[in-house]
Amino acid sequence: MKEGIHPEYREVVFMDVQTGNKFITRSTIHTRETVEMDGKTYPLFKCDVTSESHPFYTGAQTRIVETGRVEKFRARFARTAGTVKSAS
């Protein structure tokens, strides 16, 4: 492999902005901010959404149930089912 073409792969702290939760993982991301954690200084990346705050993972997700095509058809024509147009 060629030297000097690969980005630096290092430990980075990702912080969830909504919850304030921080976790360390490895990444090639470049940041200007740093944070001290466990006695070491790490680059800090602030995330808007992580598994700590996303509604799908927290169980706070509300499911929108859409009625199907058949139900929409039945609801629309249920009103007119009792009335019959005269053929005059």
Curated annotation (Swiss-Prot):
**Record's InterPro entries?**
Ribosomal_bL28/bL31-like_sf, Ribosomal_bL31, Ribosomal_bL31_B, Ribosomal_bL31_sf
The UniProt entry, under SUPFAM superfamilies, shows:
L28p-like (SSF143800)
Q: Which PROSITE patterns match?
A: RIBOSOMAL_L31
Q: Which GO biological process categories is it annotated with?
A: translation
MF terms per GO, please?
A: structural constituent of ribosome
The domain of life for this entry's organism is Bacteria
* A Gene Ontology cellular-component term: ribonucleoprotein complex
UniProt keyword list: Ribonucleoprotein, Ribosomal protein
The family this protein is said to belong to:
Belongs to the bacterial ribosomal protein bL31 family. Type B subfamily.
* Binding partners and assembly: Part of the 50S ribosomal subunit.
Q: What is this protein called?
A: Large ribosomal subunit protein bL31B
Organism taxonomic ancestry: Bacteria, Pseudomonadati, Pseudomonadota, Betaproteobacteria, Burkholderiales
Point out the gene that encodes the protein: rpmE2
